[in-house]
Regions:
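FAD-dinucleotide binding site
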Residues: 1-412
Length: 412
């Protein structure tokens, strides 16, 4: 154990925690990063398949790349940034979505977001599903899209919160993996892995942080664990922090799981094309064919569909994917695909989901969650971001903001 007494402890080694700890390290502020997993990165996790390809099981896109601080980190690390337009910016495969129908869907999509923008200006909040046109044939697909974007269906999501998300529509990727990027950025900071934080006592002159490897005394702490972990009270606070728990309950984690599938005779397809299994139901996956030009498919499952499949593991996801793919591409297509890997984020004990959304009426919980307690207990993470929630750069920005608050509180 590096130290049982340190000035600042950062709890959680995801994007927010790594960014905060690195800021302290660079400012020569004594800090210890404590992470429950045997690795850094949190919900940014890259694995390597048998062909040597880096696969992002968690976040994979440098969203709003023209203002995303992880881009500069990637450049400094010498990582390869792929600026190929994302598949959702292109027209889907004709076999799954004829051109005329896709144009009609895009119109419905744009009209929905126009209604969202108008409704968000009103004082009252409501579920985003109230903005669906009851006569539209595209409501199921709009809902399916919501499960990829937010990890949840529109009936569960605050329209005000959804409208507050800011995107520049510039989306890049890191060939070596987003998870690789995040974990490497924290490699030089003092840290403890495989160490859960069970309780934080902030009632005394100094903080007492109870971990699976013993107690740590500290002056200040930044808590960066996912909102679902706080809501489940996996970390006990003394004195209790009921406002934080209530805020976290209003910011549940949606679910978005990715299944990677190997593809034979991939040259038949263009690079980075997309198809939907179905365009007339919510429980459908989105399929990104040949990402980076690789002979594989990234299959995206979200919301209740992903939750229903998780108990069955990789086999359930693959069976679902094959049934949809053969429906679009023919029965022989089943012979060309094999599962590579999937990670079930909802079943992950240190995440309990993928990324946060606000439930109707709870959009302002992000600010409540982000507020420090007595100038000693600080909070960060994508769920604390008003405009960049659900992203690794949202995690970074809140982590840096919390670190700067700590530095200011200690007088430089």
């Amino acid at each position: 154990m590096p130290s049982s007494d340190v000035e600042v402890v950062v709890v959680g080694g995801g994007a927010a925690g790594v960014a905060a700890a690195r800021r302290f390290h660079d400012a020569s502020v004594p800090c210890l990063l404590v992470e429950a997993r045997p690795r850094l990165g949190g919900r940014a996790w890259t694995v390597t398949d048998q062909s040597g390809f880096a696969l992002d099981l968690g976040c994979g896109w440098l969203h709003s790349a023209d203002r995303n601080p992880w881009v500069a980190v990637a450049q400094a690390q010498g990582a390869t940034i792929d600026k190929t337009p994302p598949p959702w910016m292109n027209r889907p495969l004709e076999a799954s979505f004829p051109r005329s129908e896709h144009a009609d869907f895009r119109k419905a999509f744009d009209e929905f977001y126009a209604r969202l923008d108008e409704a968000a200006r009103r004082e009252t909040d409501a579920a985003a599903s109230t903005l669906l046109d009851p006569k539209s044939r595209w409501n199921a697909l709009l809902n399916a899209m919501s499960t990829y974007i937010s990890g949840a269906e529109l009936d569960r999501i605050s329209l005000k919160d959804l409208d507050r998300y800011h995107s520049t529509d510039v989306n890049w990727r890191v060939v070596e993996g987003y998870g690789t990027l995040v974990s490497a950025y924290g490699a030089d900071v003092p840290l403890m892995l495989d160490c859960t934080v069970d309780a934080i006592d902030h009632g005394g002159k100094r903080l007492k942080i109870e971990t699976s490897k013993g107690a740590i005394a500290a002056d200040r702490v930044i808590v960066t664990v996912p909102s679902a972990i706080l809501a489940a009270e996996r970390i006990r606070f003394g004195p209790a922090l009921p406002k934080k728990i209530q805020a976290a309950l209003g910011l549940p984690l949606g679910l978005a799981d990715k299944l990677f599938i190997s593809l034979q005779n991939a040259e038949e397809f263009e690079t980075s094309v997309r198809l939907f299994g179905h365009t007339d139901r919510v429980a459908t996956a989105g399929y990104h064919i040949k990402p980076f030009g690789r002979p594989m498919i990234e299959a995206y499952f979200g919301g209740r569909c992903a939750a229903d499949l998780e108990p069955g593991g990789e086999a359930a996801f693959f069976d679902f994917a094959v049934s949809e793919l053969v429906g679009v591409l023919g029965s022989d297509f089943a012979k060309r695909v094999k599962p590579i890997c999937v990670h079930c984020w909802g079943s992950d004990p240190f995440a309990l989901g993928s990324y946060s959304f606000a439930t109707p009426g709870f959009a302002d919980c992000r600010q409540t969650l982000a507020e420090p307690v007595d100038g000693r207990v600080f909070f960060a993470g994508e769920a604390c971001s008003r405009h960049d929630f659900s992203t690794a750069h949202g995690g970074w920005l809140t982590g840096i903001a919390a670190a700067e608050q700590v530095i200011a509180a200690r007088g430089g």
